[in-house]
Amino acid sequence: MRTFCRTIIALYLWVLPAFAASKPHVISFGKVTTVKWLVGPNEDQALDLRVRALYVDTRLKEFTVGSPHEVTDRLFVVRRVFRVNDSLPEESSATPRWHWQRGGWLMVDRVTGRISQISLPEFDVYYSTPSWYRDYAAYCGVSDDGKKLFAVVARLGRRKPILKKALGDAAGDDLPDSECPAPLWQRQPARVTFEPDEKQKLTYSVRGHAVDIVNDSEEDESSAE
């Protein structure tokens, strides 16, 4: 009898971690709260941000803005916002002056509950406006010195972009998202169009890890179909 009981206990202790590991996580968003985002060269213009808290198993993990993009039935991406302390050194003993800032993008795994930051090449948190399709992100990237503009298509899981095409000099004003509109996607076939200004319209065909430019005749044939 003792041997039987020991066997049952051993099996229980062996199986228990497996059940604990497979317990599903609950991913949820909080209510929308409107906060002020100070922009411009002097940070004297206030824009509204509609912020939501991101919870994993009722625990606050991040703050987000905008709608999430469903990549798969398991993964989604969403943009991060955060608060930074704007206090000066001589004000360190005072109450922190929290200022909201817009950040990069997060990838959330519903099964593991893991939240990870996405590295998007040439992505500028102030000027770049990404457009998501499947596991691709298309946006206008900005060089590190802020002088050059690029058409960029990045794919989740890849360090290098599958497209990086120079678009000329950066010409955005002091407002966020002013470099160029979000690119437009279409499917069957998968294509993305960049229009950084009235004089430029570039369409690219996306096939896996490869991107090809679409000429005018191909675009006309696709429209006719």
Give each language-model segment a name:
Residues 65-72, 128-136, 177-192:
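Blade-terminus and WD-like Trp-Asp/Gly-His loop motifs, strongest in beta-propeller folds
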Residues 2-10, 14:
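Sec-dependent signal peptide recognition
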Residues 179-225:
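Hydrophilic extracytoplasmic domains
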Residues 27-61, 99-120, 150-169, 202-222:
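Surface-exposed loop/turn elements that mediate protein-protein interactions on large endomembrane-trafficking
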Residues 121-127, 167-175:
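Short coil/turn segments at the loop-to-beta-strand junctions that recur within blades
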Residues 53-129:
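Surface-exposed acidic loop/strand-edge motifs in secreted or periplasmic proteins
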Residues 79-82, 96-99, 138-145, 193-199:
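Beta-strand C-termini and the immediately following turn/loop, strongest in propeller blades
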Residues 18-22:
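Boundary at the C-terminal end of the N-terminal hydrophobic targeting segment
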